[in-house]
């Protein structure tokens, strides 16, 4: 007697359901894909008991004839493809012909459908995959599918479902992603007979406000790039909107909701140091590519895809995201306590909860614009305060305006500080100086923050993280270019390492040389410092090197960093000016100029904000002027 037997369809369907129907959200996803493929422009989702008791999807799509309705619940029956070659030109979301058979086999399943030409609709009712009732029914054009008592006949699967809150969240995320991917469709959702949302207008930004709170869309960066191979459109979130949940990253490839590790990693790397450790940015991106260049038949759940040339896609995708980020001003605005917070978006303990962004839809200013805003803030209107130049020792090297590709005019003016601004008499009309002869006004607050008057209000800079950003980019560039910029010490300094310090020293020795450290072995875990980078303060050579090694080890144990990136971060953190250090006026100006010459002036290498702005409009509102 043969030991191998063909499984009955009902058993095969239950096994298949283990892959296709993992939880109530899986049912919702499969049914929504069918509704969209049917051409619906109105879809309603209703659930009870987080989908365990009921899932109902109502659409106004094409509907089905009787023979199609009976076939659609059969395994491997589909209208989407007829041959294997159709997979190379697939335009529909569904194609496997497994979903309804799998769902009906583990639930009490009801299907009601009517086509536009039919006067009477059809009702089919299944229990455990077996048809138990067929009847006519009145109803609107389209299809309604009700799934009751999911996994009622598979107790082991039902037992492993999570709490109602967890299952509800999974369902809501699925529906939300489809509502964002298909703005041309009117969506309505109910949970336990309570309406959760109803979105009609085909506006993605408006829908983002519905799901994430008012003014959320104002913090989006819009991008649109395309070539003959790939089209990329959508929205990027500003760094202060970063989250720990990757659920708030939406990738739609040919309008299909997908998860793709390469795309997620490329976005994360493009944001780079703008992100705090273990945070992810909000993104909503539509990628359009020739269907023959992707494989959607990776898993029965159809959430994963493969690109035929993933490297080529990444080489196009990453620069687009990086360029969009670099072209926008990421300095947050201070907001009064009266202003609304995006509490639904931001983590409760986030350091960025005090920050929000200006309501400037469809437009953001560039780094160069902010620098010019800072330069033009030197001039008060209608009157200009008397200012005088101050010349003191420089901690930061000054650069000519030609050194700043994004920095605007690179003017050099003077300022005596806060007391001179308050006490100086106003200029007469005939002695008002040329605005280009006046330096922007800068004050140091508590030897920690730099306050600058800008044309549109006020800018506050954290002096430590600003200098850290400057030093970090210099260090990265010097190491990558392999042109050490070292200043020799008149009296070499001896350093005796502990065993663990010497081990790390050996690991980074070559890159220390690239950075500008001229170090000579002296035997028995001892070295002589004969030269250091020009940014190292005299007298601090030994301390800086030891602190760098300690910082490097700490970063290596907590973060997954490239060796040079780790070294640059360690160097900049330990060598930057500290909070509490008094700066001269020239040092403050030079620091700001150098900051705006960097590629990413809005965050330090560890992701903390460098610049905060307070606009005149916000000040006027705080003082009741508006």
UniProtKB/Swiss-Prot annotation:
GO CC terms, sorted: mismatch repair complex
Gene Ontology MF: a single term: ATP hydrolysis activity
InterPro entries, alphabetized: DNA_mismatch_repair_CS, DNA_mismatch_repair_MutL, DNA_mismatch_S5_2-like, HATPase_C_sf, MutL/Mlh/PMS, MutL/Mlh/Pms-like, MutL_C, MutL_C_dimsub
Keyword DNA damage: yes
SUPFAM superfamilies: ATPase domain of HSP90 chaperone/DNA topoisomerase II/histidine kinase (SSF55874), DNA mismatch repair protein MutL (SSF118116), Ribosomal protein S5 domain 2-like (SSF54211)
BP-aspect Gene Ontology terms: mismatch repair
Coiled-coil zones: none
PANTHER family in UniProt: DNA MISMATCH REPAIR PROTEIN MLH, PMS, MUTL (PTHR10073), DNA MISMATCH REPAIR PROTEIN MLH1 (PTHR10073:SF12)
Known role: This protein is involved in the repair of mismatches in DNA. It is required for dam-dependent methyl-directed DNA mismatch repair. May act as a 'molecular matchmaker', a protein that promotes the formation of a stable complex between two or more DNA-binding proteins in an ATP-dependent manner without itself being part of a final effector complex.
Family assignment from sequence similarity: Belongs to the DNA mismatch repair MutL/HexB family.
Protein name: DNA mismatch repair protein MutL
């Amino acid at each position: 007697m043969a030991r191998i037997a063909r499984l009955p369809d009902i058993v095969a369907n239950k096994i298949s359901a283990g892959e296709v129907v993992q939880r109530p959200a899986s049912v919702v996803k499969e049914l929504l894909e069918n509704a969209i493929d049917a051409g619906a422009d109105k879809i309603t989702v209703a659930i009870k008991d987080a989908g365990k008791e009921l899932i109902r999807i109502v659409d106004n799509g094409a509907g089905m004839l009787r023979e199609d309705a009976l076939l659609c619940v059969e395994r491997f029956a589909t209208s989407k493809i007829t041959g294997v070659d159709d997979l190379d030109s697939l335009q529909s979301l569904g194609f496997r012909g497994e979903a309804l058979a799998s769902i009906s086999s583990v639930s009490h399943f009801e299907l009601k459908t009517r086509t536009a030409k039919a006067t009477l609709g059809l009702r089919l009712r299944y229990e455990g995959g077996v048809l138990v009732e067929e009847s006519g029914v009145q109803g609107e054009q389209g299809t309604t599918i009700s799934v009751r008592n999911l996994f009622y006949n598979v107790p082991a699967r039902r037992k492993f479902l999570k709490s109602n809150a967890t299952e509800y969240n999974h369902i809501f995320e699925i529906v939300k992603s489809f509502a964002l991917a298909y703005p041309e469709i009117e969506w309505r959702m109910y949970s336990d007979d309570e309406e959760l949302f109803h979105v009609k207008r085909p506006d993605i930004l408006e829908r983002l406000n519905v799901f994430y709170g008012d003014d959320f869309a104002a913090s989006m960066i819009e991008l649109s790039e395309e070539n003959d191979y790939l089209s990329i459109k959508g929205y990027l979130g500003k760094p202060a909107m970063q989250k720990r949940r990757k659920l708030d990253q939406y990738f739609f490839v040919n309008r299909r909701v997908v998860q793709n590790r390469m795309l997620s990693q490329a976005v994360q790397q493009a944001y780079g140091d703008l992100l705090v450790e273990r945070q992810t940015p909000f993104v909503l991106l539509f990628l359009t590519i020739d269907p023959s260049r992707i494989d959607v038949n990776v898993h029965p759940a159809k959430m994963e895809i493969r690109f035929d040339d993933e490297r080529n896609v990444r080489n196009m995708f990453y620069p687009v995201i990086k360029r969009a980020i670099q072209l926008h001003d990421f300095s947050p605005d201070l907001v009064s306590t009266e202003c609304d917070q995006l509490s639904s978006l931001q983590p409760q303990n986030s350091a960025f909860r005090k920050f929000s962004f200006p309501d400037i839809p469809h437009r953001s200013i560039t780094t160069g614009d902010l620098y010019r805003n800072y330069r033009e803030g030197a001039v008060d209107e209608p009157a200009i305060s008397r200012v005088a130049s101050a010349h003191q020792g420089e901690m930061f090297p000054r650069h000519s305006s030609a050194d700043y590709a994004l920095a605007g005019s690179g003017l050099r003016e003077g300022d005596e500080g806060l007391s001179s601004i308050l006490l100086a008499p106003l200029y007469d009309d005939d002695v008002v100086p040329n605005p280009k002869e006046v330096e922007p006004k800068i004050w140091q607050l508590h030897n920690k923050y730099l306050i600058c008057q800008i044309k549109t209000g006020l800018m506050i800079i954290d002096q430590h993280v600003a200098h850290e950003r400057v030093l970090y980019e210099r260090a990265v560039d010097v190491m990558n270019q392999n042109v050490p910029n070292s200043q020799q010490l008149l009296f070499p300094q001896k350093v005796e390492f502990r065993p663990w310090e010497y081990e790390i020293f050996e690991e980074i020795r070559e890159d220390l040389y690239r950075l500008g450290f001229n170090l000579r072995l002296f035997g028995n875990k001892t070295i002589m410092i004969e030269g250091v980078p020009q940014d190292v303060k005299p007298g601090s050579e030994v301390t800086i090197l030891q602190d760098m090694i300690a910082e490097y080890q700490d970063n290596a144990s907590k973060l997954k960093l490239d060796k040079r990136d780790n070294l640059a971060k360690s160097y900049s953190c330990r060598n930057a000016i500290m909070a509490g250090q008094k700066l001269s006026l020239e040092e403050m100006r030079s620091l700001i100029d150098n900051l705006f010459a960097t590629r990413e002036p809005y965050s330090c290498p560890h992701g903390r904000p460098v610049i905060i702005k307070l606009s005149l409009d916000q000040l006027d509102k705080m003082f009741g002027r508006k």
